[in-house]
Every structure is written in structure tokens, then in C-alpha cells.
Amino acid sequence: RDIAESVKNTKELQKNIKKYISSNNGYIKDEYNYIREAIAKTINTINEIKNSKDEIDVLSKSELLKEYLKGLDVIATRRIDILIREKRIDKKMATSLLNDSYHANLIISRLISVSKVLWIQDLTIKELGEDYEASKNF
């Protein structure tokens, strides 16, 4: 289900990437390249995770990816806010960028979840990851 949702989000994101990558506005181009790079970095890291024989390593790298994702969200929101205040992008661009940043975060989050499901077989390690997730929510 996460894979199907990621594909759906990717289709929505792809429309605006195509539109804004060819824009004359360098600021919006940079932001969409930033989104593309974040997704690409995640996919590359997941490929590295896939080749790991150590399931604890898979879990720890997955958690590091999640921390990276949180940092991206904070940075992206701050950057978009600055671009709006400095009138570097218009309201329509800002709305698209906020929505697409959200979709990119969903895609990355789901890819991380799928990677853990696919490459962690040991139930104890899976539970350890779930316990860690639950403890962060308190």
C-alpha cells in the first residue's frame, strides 16, 4: 500500500517539477531541484541499506533517514517562508511548493517504511524499531 501511495504522490509531484524546472524563476527552480535531490538521496541510501546484511544496520540507517527527513521539512519550510517574504516567488508558486514539499516528505517517509518491511526479517529487530518510533511520539 505504501508503494502505491508513493507512486500516486510521485505522479502529482512530477507535474510541478516539470513545470517549474523550466521556469525563468531561478529561485523556484532551485527549490524543485532541492526536492528532487532529497528524493534521489533517499533512494540511493535505501539502495545501500538493501545491500546490508546486518538488520540492525538497516534499522539504524532507516532511522537516520527519518531524521534527515525531519530536517528537510524544517529547512524547506524556512526557505519557502523567506522566498515569500522577499517576494522571490509568487503566491501560486509558494502554494505549489508547499504542497509538493509535503508530497515529497510523504514519498520519502513511505519509501523508508517499505525498506524496513522488505529488508528487516527478524521480528525482534522490527519490534525494536517500532518501540523506538513509539518512544519518540511521547
Give the label of every model feature segment:
Residues 1-138:
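Cytosolic, long alpha-helical scaffolding segments
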